[in-house]
Curated annotation (Swiss-Prot), chain B:
EC number: 7.1.1.2
GO molecular function: NADH dehydrogenase (ubiquinone) activity; ubiquinone binding
TM ranges: 4-24, 29-49, 59-79, 88-110, 114-136, 144-164, 182-202, 221-241, 252-272, 282-304, 309-331, 345-365, 390-410, 432-452
Family recorded in the similarity comment: Belongs to the complex I subunit 4 family.
Any Gene Ontology biological process: electron transport coupled proton transport
Organism of provenance: Branchiostoma lanceolatum (Common lancelet)
Reactions the enzyme catalyzes: a ubiquinone + NADH + 5 H(+)(in) = a ubiquinol + NAD(+) + 4 H(+)(out)
GO cellular component, one term: mitochondrial membrane
Compartment list: Mitochondrion membrane
Protein's name according to its UniProt entry: NADH-ubiquinone oxidoreductase chain 4
């Protein structure tokens, strides 16, 4: 007995303990000595780490990223998915989407644009949303539903703006949008709660316009894309590695993005993902991605002059306020857009309304944080609300939130296409507030551009990056 | 000839200890230098080495040994582009894997003892598995590695058992002593022979057990594809030749079953190739078709069949390896292997189109390429075995020509893809690679001593 106790005390309690301590310390020292990265395994396998080679890397897991991923897999026949070089990785740095534009958006869809491409994109998207069960159903799962309320948009115009509204209406009708012009008298009859002082003309979308839940659309796209074989990881893209080789043109190098450095969350571990094609759908932070490869910086050698044109996307903060008005317009309240840019719509069935306004250039809020400025509501929006609808004089502000527009500072329209220098970089940025309603169409367009080499269904070449090089901005007049 | 294998051992050590800037130089220059002792082998007589009693070489092993030695610097040349960004230790392991693989192959082809051959045969498995699963491109490479490993292992276990059985019956496994064949007259000796040959049929591969090949070839990196298509498949053919001679004609009773599968395989693989959308997959399936003809040639048992199979193996090694290099060249620039995504290349890369052209023509056995001579000789042997086989062989030849032209036409001609604006020029490294494949292939046209 005594011998066993002594044995246990000296051997197990003594030598083994010393050994375990020493071995543990040695392991710790080894771990800190070896610099983490793709070259060495630190001893703990991060299950979130992506593989080291993908054919297509989509930077940004918002609605644009997942829409593109879905359409890429959708275009490939089933037995060839993943086999003929279509491994897709979606990298998202915040899967809870706390600051993403997609989930903080109001989720409206309208065909009332002036550019034909915008109108066509929204028409396809509304068709997509209406038939979302055929597109995005996953086997053995509940069919997706985005709560589409096709209530319509009512654009109001004063006497000065009536001519432009009529021209826009003609463009929209020519492309097949179901919109109808209302005179002042007709508006008064249809919407008796609306105050038509100063209003000359109204353009109302009868079908395919309204609002839906952007979170549900994002989740439906994500689920379907994952079921088709798209890989995703939670990580942040910190760098893009470029290789430059001599090409056919004398003196200019052919540049290609070869690797994407994806950093793991809360860690210094990163993976050097070898990427064949890279799609930038990073939303408001698209310019950070572009800056990593010198887009927008002076080229010291002066050879690649196209690099001087930056990707003109920056985050702009916009507020959305929800208020309650018991005597308000009621169930037939569409999304009303005031000539001043203020908009409001019904939210739910309990007498709540949602409103907002794009601030003027001089009163742009600080985009470093998502704090809500209630003075903006009290001083700028509420007077206009009260002016437009009598009942809105007595309201109670329930809640508000702020989100980012991925604002295209040049012409507030989408940037879709390849970059002239890096031709395995695809861009889908700068939607400036009307991205969620163009997401299905944009995803399909980028997928066609990547897989077929050109746009097949909707020709969006006018939205390419080259317009900044040629200084030919495309202006959209109906910006909300 | 033992010093040749020691040379490779030294090269592995050299790759491990040299500094970072010299790793690839040591690998490439060393492997080129190791070709000089290989020229000693080119005397086509059966030689027993005076350095070691374990190594012999006769005309069967000569061609394949030189082929595997020749392919090592080409493999290193082809893969240095995509290995540039890896960390140093992984580069060392990569180069070391290939050198070790070539050393094991040389040992296998020059072994004079069947058990040594078996050991070398098995030891080529591990470096290839490492190449495929670690440096392959898609995530399907894990499944490809599993298929490759298990097919080969399941096939080679009967080989070990039957070799040991043969040792028990005959008393020795040395090759130069056993040209007589096991002299038994019962039909049971057939099963011993089938057990031996199963490993090689899986390795070749025969049509029914070929599933691992498209997966492994497609998922492997360029070096892996080159060595797989160029040499490892030929291990199967070589092994079949050695083992069949050992057991004798009485053992090859069921050769007709495998011959039938092989003949059918030629036709079916021709058809499958015409339906492929992946560039590498097409070349991989064409390998199965060519090797099916090799199986046919060997299993006839006559000298002409052996000659034809030998020449076909050497020719196919060079042509297939070059085609993989060319496909990889395009893949490195465009990140796609899809045939419909790589059209009109003759307008972008005219000179390397010459490489595509010559290799596609040689693939479909156009005279005067040696592929034709190999096919012709093997076909004559098969016709001698059965006149009805001419149906399958001619159909196979037509389909081979069809898919070779399809490969060339789809990739080179047609409307050039518009979304590739920034493709860098073909480097001289890639031209050298293609030339080094073409030069032996064209030189061998004039070296008829290979066959007769």
């Amino acid at each position: 007995m005594n011998a066993i106790r002594t044995f246990r005390r000296t051997f197990v309690g003594g030598y083994m303990k010393i050994f375990d301590e020493g071995w543990g310390k040695a392991k710790q020292r080894m771990k800190t000595a070896i610099k983490p990265g793709p070259g060495f395994d630190v001893g703990w396998n991060n299950p979130n780490m992506p593989l080291n080679n993908y054919d297509i890397v989509i930077i940004g897991g918002g609605v644009m990223g997942w829409s593109t991923a879905y359409w890429l897999m959708h275009k490939v026949p089933r037995k060839a998915r993943g086999k003929i070089g279509l491994n897709v990785l979606v990298v998202e740095k915040d899967p809870s989407y706390t600051r993403a534009s997609t989930v903080l958006s109001v989720g409206s869809i309208r065909q009332q644009f002036t550019l034909p491409e915008n109108i066509n994109m929204s028409m396809f998207s509304s068709h997509f949303i209406r038939n979302i069960r055929e597109y995005l159903s996953v086997y053995e799962d509940d069919p997706p539903d985005v709560q589409f309320n096709p209530q319509g948009y009512l654009f109001l115009a004063t006497a000065e703006g009536a001519e432009q509204l009529k021209q826009a209406h003609d463009t929209q009708v020519a492309l097949g949008a179901k919109v109808r012009l209302f005179t002042k008298r007709q508006i008064e009859v249809k919407f008796p709660w609306l105050n038509t002082d100063g209003i000359e003309l109204g353009n109302y979308g009868m079908e395919n316009e309204g609002w839906f839940d952007p979170w549900l659309l994002l989740m439906a796209l994500k689920k379907k894309a994952i079921s088709l074989g798209v890989n995703h990881c939670h990580g942040e893209v910190t760098d893009l590695v470029v290789e430059a080789k001599p090409g056919v043109v004398e003196g200019r190098l052919c540049k290609r993005i070869t690797h994407v450095k994806v950093k793991m969350p809360n860690s210094i571990q990163y993976q050097n993902v070898k990427a064949g094609h890279i799609i930038n759908t990073a939303g408001p932070w698209a310019q950070d991605i572009a800056k990593m490869i010198g887009i927008g910086q002076e080229d010291p050698m002066g050879l690649d002059w196209e690099l001087q044109a930056p990707l003109p996307v920056e985050p702009r903060k916009r507020f959305v306020y929800v208020f309650h008005c018991p005597q308000g317009p009621g169930l037939d309240c569409p999304m009303v857009v005031d000539p001043s840019g203020m908009y409001f719509r019904r939210e739910g069935l309990a007498g709540n309304y949602l409103c907002g306004k794009s601030p003027e250039e001089h009163e742009e809020p600080d985009a470093k944080h998502l704090e809500v400025d209630y003075d903006f509501f009290n001083e700028t929006i509420w007077p206009k609300l009260a002016n437009r609808v009598q009942a809105f004089e007595e309201i109670k502000l329930r809640m508000a939130w702020a989100g980012y527009y991925d604002y295209n500072t040049v012409d507030q329209n989408a940037i879709i296409g390849t970059h002239p220098i890096y031709d395995n970089l695809y861009l889908a940025n700068g939607f400036s507030g009307h991205g969620i309603q163009q997401a299905p169409a944009v995803g399909r367009a980028v997928a066609e551009l990547l897989l077929d080499g050109e746009f097949k269904t909707l020709d969006l070449t006018r939205f390419g990056f080259e317009r900044f090089l040629r200084n030919e901005p495309i202006r959209e007049k109906n910006i909300v | 000839m033992n010093h040749l294998v020691l040379g490779y051992v030294g090269l592995v050590i050299g790759v491990i200890v040299t500094k970072k800037s010299m790793v690839w130089r040591v690998g490439q220059v060393g492997s080129v230098l190791l070709m000089l002792p290989a020229t000693v082998l080119v005397n086509m007589n059966m030689t027993i080495s005076n350095v070691s009693y374990m190594m012999t070489s006769d005309f069967v092993s000569l061609g394949l040994t030189v082929l595997s030695i020749w392919l090592l610097p080409l493999m290193l040349l082809a893969s240095q582009q995509h290995m540039v960004s890896e960390s140093l230790i992984y580069q060392r392991v990569f180069v070391g894997c290939q050198v070790f693989l070539t050393g094991a192959l040389v040992l296998a082809f020059m072994a004079s003892d069947l058990l040594l051959f078996y050991i070398a045969f098995e030891s080529t498995l591990l470096p290839t598995l490492m190449l495929i699963t670690r440096w392959g491109a898609q995530k399907e490479r894990y499944q490809a590695g599993t298929y490759f490993m298990f097919f080969t292992l399941v096939g080679s276990l009967p080989l070990l058992i039957c070799l040991i059985g043969q040792y028990q019956m005959v008393g020795s496994l040395a090759l130069d002593l056993s040209y007589e064949g096991v002299f038994q007259l019962s039909y049971l000796v057939n099963f011993w022979w089938v057990g031996c040959i199963l490993a090689f049929l899986v390795k070749l591969p025969l049509y029914g057990v070929h599933l691992w090949l498209p997966k492994a070839h497609v998922e492997a990196p360029i070096a892996g594809s080159m060595v797989l298509a160029g040499v490892l498949l030929k291990l199967g053919g070589y092994g079949m030749m050695r083992v069949s001679l050992m057991w004798g004609a009485t053992a090859m009773l069921s050769s007709e079953v495998f011959l039938a599968l092989a003949l059918w395989g030629i036709v079916v693989m021709g058809g499958i190739c015409l339906r492929q959308t992946d560039l590498k997959s097409l070349i991989a399936y064409s390998s199965v078709g060519h090797m099916a003809l090799v199986v046919g040639g060997v299993l006839t048992g006559v000298a002409w069949g052996y000659n034809g199979a030998m020449v076909l193996m050497i020719a196919h090694g060079l042509v297939s390896s070059c085609l993989f290099c060319l496909a990889n060249l395009w893949y490195e620039r465009s990140s796609t292997r899809n045939l419909s995504g790589s059209r009109g290349l003759i307008m972008i890369f005219p000179l390397i189109s010459l490489g595509w052209f010559l290799m596609s023509l040689m693939n479909m056995a156009l005279p005067p390429a040696i592929n034709l001579f190999g096919e012709l000789v093997a076909m004559v042997a098969l016709y001698n075995w059965s006149p009805y086989s001419i149906v399958y062989m001619s159909l196979g030849a037509v389909l081979t020509a069809a898919y070779s032209l399809y490969l060339f036409g789809m990739s080179q001609w047609g409307n050039t893809m518009k979304n590739y604006k920034n493709l860098y020029t073909i480097t001289s490294r890639e031209y050298l690679l293609t030339t080094l494949h073409l030069v032996p292939a064209i030189y061998l046209i004039f070296y008829l001593g290979l066959m007769f």
